[in-house]
């Protein structure tokens, strides 16, 4: 779910708390991300005995699905958010080995046969560095299957949130802030993957509009989580309410997903 420390602002909290997530709530509200992950997992070609990496494991719901695909293998789960790593390890126990790491600085006990990632790469500012780190973690001919936010992702919602952030009592807290997201284009992503040593590359954008029946906990935990980092606690409820009022009901999020399928260059051993 989260993969890099460089995107968040430093005006609230310590580096650890500032970059953390509410793992318990995310585990409950992330049904859209889990549904997309189930689709993407079908793209992996696995026998069942591979060593695989979940790059940006979040609360571990998707990691559990991945572990089911390799009953005779092992899953490494990496996330930059301490609460997510703790939640994943507690939920899955010996089925996985979870590490709190920046994805651009991966250090795993061994090379992996495949890397899977869901709803994470758009949190990483430096995609060339990310893809180089992933390639280094893979065995030759290892698979990369990923999906993240792509160019145009929730543009309408982010525009509304920016309008609220620039107004009234909220404005001083967002002065000069541009947000941590990196919603990349498919063609540029393919070029970066190739430069990092990947081959058999396929990248494409996919609109996935999503309506939320209970939007408040979702936007608080997912869409506005980094906005709220900048606000004092007493302003958080009014900020969320103002954004949701502008967005209207039912809340339709104009998600655009960037799909990635590739292999590390080289011959399988």
Regions found by a protein language model. Name each.
Residues 128-143:
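A short glycine-rich, Lys/Arg-flanked "PGG" loop and its adjoining helix->strand segment in the class I
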Residues 53-55, 59-106:
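Class I SAM-dependent methyltransferase SAM/SAH-binding core
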Residues 114-127:
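A short SAM/SAH-binding and catalytic strip from SAM-dependent methyltransferases
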Residues 104-115:
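A short acidic, Gly/Pro-enriched loop at the edge of an enzyme's catalytic core
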Residues 59-61, 179-269:
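Conserved Class I S-adenosyl-L-methionine
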Residues 144-145, 200:
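A short hydrophobic/small-residue beta-strand
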Residues 2-48, 61-65, 84-87, 145-168:
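Conserved class I S-adenosyl-L-methionine
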